Design a protein with these regions (language model features):
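Class I SAM-dependent methyltransferase Rossmann-like catalytic core
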Residues: 1-33
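Class I SAM-dependent methyltransferase SAM/SAH-binding core
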Residues: 23-24, 31, 36-81
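A short acidic, Gly/Pro-enriched loop at the edge of an enzyme's catalytic core
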Residues: 79-91
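A conserved beta-strand element that flanks and buttresses the S-adenosyl-L-methionine
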Residues: 92, 97, 101
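Conserved catalytic-core motifs of eukaryotic protein kinase domains, centered on the activation segment
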Residues: 102-107
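A short glycine-rich, Lys/Arg-flanked "PGG" loop and its adjoining helix->strand segment in the class I
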Residues: 109-130
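Acceptor-substrate binding/catalytic loop of class I
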Residues: 111-112, 133, 138-157
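Short alpha-helix
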Residues: 119, 146-171
């Protein structure tokens, strides 16, 4: 047993970044209607919802054990994705790349972990495919061992061969 002292609030707490980014991806996948959608390390919950509209695949370094129709669970690392080059039409990776290489989730320590992850994402998304990516942006820094914050240009440089179609931001107060 342990005391829970911070849940008696006047309103329900909301993690706006996670709520809005998952809703954005769900709506985009629903519009695109790909045969398959792959999520790399975001949340199995979102992948479970997407499984209601298309074949969903969730890959994470830490396996999850849930039984959801139309959802394939895969164990693997974003630093070495188990997919062929240019093979995936629809891929999401939400609030993941900023953690890679810091050891927080059992990944190897690697100063270039985020760059390697982005290179792998770029490798597997096929020409004309879609990559839905989110990450903290701001003054570039490492908040060891929690996450990195990126200058937007750093991310654009990691994905030079991609065309940016949409840029959205959710601030710390939950405003779009």
């Amino acid at each position: 047993m342990y005391p829970i002292l911070d849940e008696k609030t006047k309103i329900t707490g909301v993690d706006y970044q996670y709520l809005y980014q998952q809703l954005w991806v769900f709506n985009e996948v629903n519009k695109l209607k790909p045969k398959d959608h792959y999520d790399i390390g975001s949340t199995y919950q979102m992948s479970g919802y997407i499984a209601g509209i298309t074949n969903a695949h969730f890959l994470d370094i830490r396996p999850v054990k849930v039984d959801i129709d139309n959802l394939e669970l895969l164990e693997g690392s974003i630093e070495n994705l188990p997919f062929e080059d240019n093979s995936l039409e629809s891929v999401s990776c939400l609030h993941v790349i900023e953690h890679i290489g810091l050891g927080r989730y059992g990944d190897n320590m690697n100063i270039n972990g985020s760059e390697i992850a982005c290179r792998e994402l770029g490798r597997v998304v096929k020409k004309g495919g879609y990559l839905y990516l989110s990450t903290p942006i701001g003054r570039e820094r490492v908040c060891f061992n929690a996450h990195r914050v990126f200058n937007p240009n750093t991310i654009l440089n990691y994905f030079k061969d991609f065309e940016l179609e949409e840029f959205n931001m959710v601030d710390d107060e939950g405003k779009l």
